[in-house]
Amino acid sequence: NKVSALRGGLGTMLLHSNCISDKQCDSCFFSDECLVQRIMYSKFDIKPAYITTGESVGYILECENHKRNFQKGDLLEFDLILFGKSIIHFSQLLQALFSLGQSGLGANKAHFSISDIQNETGKNILCNGNIIMSNYQPHMLQSYVEHRLTEFPYANELSNVSLIFHSPT
């Protein structure tokens, strides 16, 4: 699963470059201030009643590519959507992704480089090796949900949409 490999790889790279406690998170004196904890396990300010375990994830990784084998030069496109307080950690996530490409992704340690980064409107954030922060434009969660609803096949036929969250049993 590419999303799991990317998530695990990002976490590993963030720990590698930011952890001062030998990756012993449970006993770390600095866990409340830890960048890795803030990005990978972003805490709710107010925890909704339907959340029964764990904390929020401060981002979503989406990958529609179901290809299992990649050759040199093949592209893997994915969306990394940051939420809440994770939005300000874009640079750290980008550095972790760059480091992951250098060290390799997955069981075969496939090396990669970042060829393009775009915002949701298609404007380049990465241009000729430079980051254009003015094109990094945070939006409200509502706009993400509304955009995803337009991708739902029956969205135009519905006047009211309800999301029901089920916690694991």
Residues covered by each model-derived region:
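RNA-interacting cores
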Residues: 1-169
